[in-house]
Amino acid sequence: MTISTRKIEELFKNSISVKEDCIEKGFSSIVAMGVEITRSIESNGKIMLCGNGGSAADAQHLAAEMLIRLRPHNNREGIAAISLAQDTSTITACGNDFGYDVLYERVLRALGRSGDCLIGITTSGNSKNVILAMKAAKELNIKVFGFLGCGGGEALKYCDEAFIVPSDDTGRIQEAHITAGHALMEYVEDRLIESGYLNLL
């Protein structure tokens, strides 16, 4: 086995190990998020997601799967979701005029309504723009959920529920976040179909 092959194998093993640690911790937080998100959607609320870098990509990824579909055999109506990290004109305007730190807070205050949900994704738990959005969400009676790492960081203080990956390795945290995100989406999708809120097409 070459050195490069060993490094790839080690990466895969580390990724599996982090997910096994997540399994040991349990998934009560994901279930609790799923219950609240289902309740919000059934009350005509929406899900907002935000993050930076790879976590911004995760926010867009999960919002797209809510709006369109996650599983090919579930051709269903869309679930109201929006990534706050996808509009380059808004992102650059805010960064230029007011600063990047307030980006998600400003958008959330404009779009968010009582009864909505916010999912903030930050591997460090300390992304300032995500934390400011969480604070604003609390003021607006919006449920706040976190996909976090590194023990949760400051963001944990503002979360109604949080899924914390027990790692400080950014790549491994991101991999666990997207797995948890898919689990959460499947939970919500199943509940909304079972309740009759979502119709299969």
Feature map (PLM): residue ranges:
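Glycine-rich, small/polar surface segments that engage phosphate groups of diverse ligands
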Residues: 35, 39-111
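Short, glycine/polar-rich helix-capping loops at beta-to-alpha or helix-loop-helix junctions
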Residues: 147-159
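Short, well-ordered beta-strand core segments
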Residues: 118, 144, 161-163
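Short glycine/serine/threonine-rich phosphate/pyrophosphate-binding segments
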Residues: 56-60, 126-133, 155
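Short beta->alpha connector loops at strand-helix junctions that form conserved
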Residues: 85, 122, 148, 163-171
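Generic N-terminal amphipathic, Lys/Arg-enriched alpha-helix
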Residues: 1-25
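A charged, well-structured terminal subsegment
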Residues: 110, 171-201
